[in-house]
Amino acid sequence: MSKIIIACRDLYKSYFQGNLEVPVLHGIDLQVNEGEMVAIVGASGSGKSTLLHVLGGLDKPTRGEVTLLDRELSTISEAERGSLRNHALGFVYQFHHLLPEFSAQENVAMPLFIRRMNKKAAMEQAAAMLQRVGLGHRLTHTPGELSGGERQRAAVARALVTRPACVLADEPTGNLDRHTAEAVFDLMLELNHEANAGLVIVTHDTQLASRADRVLHLVDGMLQ
């Protein structure tokens, strides 16, 4: 039986504008097993990114619970949540969020530096991961010297360099042309399969989503 990596139960999320409550998520139930890819499809403004942020411990639910590697996030301290997030999760976004003043290799090594890995080992591991995503010849290049597809490949490498239990991807190909998007998506699937990690991807691209193990639709804050 596959291990449950990340799950939420009876999840609600609202934002408040003064006294006005703006509900975003309504009673979400979800679990993702190791090695499983789940695609969540929804229109802009449907709450996809909010759901991903709550699952990743970047935002707190209004009600309900989120469990990551059998630990309920609301029951642990902020420091413990940060440590668990850094060790168990990888994040990929539509915009690469690479640090412009650092090389591709240094950017990919950042999560390892946060883990206090020594610099030599971290840089070697980052170089190996960049080689794996086809950027072994671009180690010393800054993000400004990379193409859009190369920057997103570097972002994927950064998300996976720590060998996370689950990757949360928010429109990871939304800023790319179709050919490059498919190449980056193929790479994510291949690397995630090799690592037997969970993968949750939110997207409006139904063609790419159809390749997931499960496709869920977020409509009016509810999963269908």
UniProtKB/Swiss-Prot annotation:
Keyword terms of this UniProt record: ATP-binding, Cell inner membrane, Cell membrane, Membrane, Nucleotide-binding, Translocase, Transport
One Pfam family matching this protein: ABC_tran
Location relative to the cell: Cell inner membrane
GO molecular function, one term: ATP hydrolysis activity
PROSITE patterns: ABC_TRANSPORTER_1, ABC_TRANSPORTER_2, LOLD
EC number: 7.6.2.-
Coiled-coil zones: none
Residue ranges of every copy of the ABC transporter domain listed in the record: 6-224
Enzyme type, top EC level: translocase
Membrane topology (UniProt): Peripheral membrane protein
Superkingdom to which the source organism belongs: Bacteria
Subunit record text: The complex is composed of two ATP-binding proteins (LolD) and two transmembrane proteins (LolC and LolE).
Similarity remark: Belongs to the ABC transporter superfamily. Lipoprotein translocase (TC 3.A.1.125) family.
Chain's role: Part of the ABC transporter complex LolCDE involved in the translocation of mature outer membrane-directed lipoproteins, from the inner membrane to the periplasmic chaperone, LolA. Responsible for the formation of the LolA-lipoprotein complex in an ATP-dependent manner.
Protein name as it appears in the record: Lipoprotein-releasing system ATP-binding protein LolD
